[in-house]
Design a protein with these regions (language model features):
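Residues forming the Rossmann-fold NAD(P)(H) cofactor-binding site
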Residues: 101, 105, 109
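C-terminal "cap" of GNAT-fold acetyltransferases
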Residues: 23-24, 85-87, 121-163
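Ser/Thr-centric signal marking residues that sit
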Residues: 68, 105, 127
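Extreme N-terminal starter segment of soluble prokaryotic enzymes
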Residues: 2-6
């Protein structure tokens, strides 16, 4: 894969990142996507540009976004006993035709590096068993399962990583 451009999104170039995130959300969760825009995407600058616990990274091929990853301040909505300055890794998605080329791993490495450079030491994420190979991928990135939750809506796997 030649000439991929990885970059941290700033306040002047986030519109296409939001559009891509909404598109991927609809692909992954069509039954809950009904046109509502999540709070973090409505307030992108607040969550990902101005907040020191926020970061949003895109990767482009021929000026088209083909993948993203982000972190934001964890809101402690699950009772998981995580450190106060934990960030939540969100929005990892690579278009299917670009997968199996190491792009997701490179996005993770860039995100982890950014977090370390900003004195972040605790990462949290959750994934779902219906996402193929997600738990295995995150384990390969150094995350450990801290809790499994079986619910009526989405079974959830909670994972964390220390930097």
């Amino acid at each position: 894969m030649n000439m991929l451009n990885y970059q941290v999104v700033g306040k002047t170039d986030y519109v296409s990142a939001v559009e891509f995130a909404l598109y991927t959300r609809q692909l992954l969760f069509p039954e809950i996507y009904h046109g509502q825009i999540p709070k973090d995407l409505q307030n992108f600058e607040q969550y990902y540009v101005h907040d020191p616990l926020g970061c949003f990274i895109t990767v482009r091929h021929q000026n088209r976004i083909i993948g993203t990853i982000a972190y934001r301040a964890y809101d402690h909505r699950f009772d998981l006993n995580l450190p106060l300055n934990t960030v939540e890794v969100v929005k990892l998605f690579v278009l299917p035709e670009y997968r199996r080329n190491g792009i997701a791993t490179q996005l993770c490495n860039m995100l982890f590096s950014h977090a370390k450079n900003h004195a972040i030491t605790s990462l949290y994420l959750h994934t779902h068993p219906f996402l193929p190979a997600a738990e295995e991928f995150w384990t390969l990135q150094g995350f450990e399962v801290i809790q499994r939750e079986w619910t009526d809506t989405y079974d959830t796997i909670h994972m964390s990583k220390s930097l």
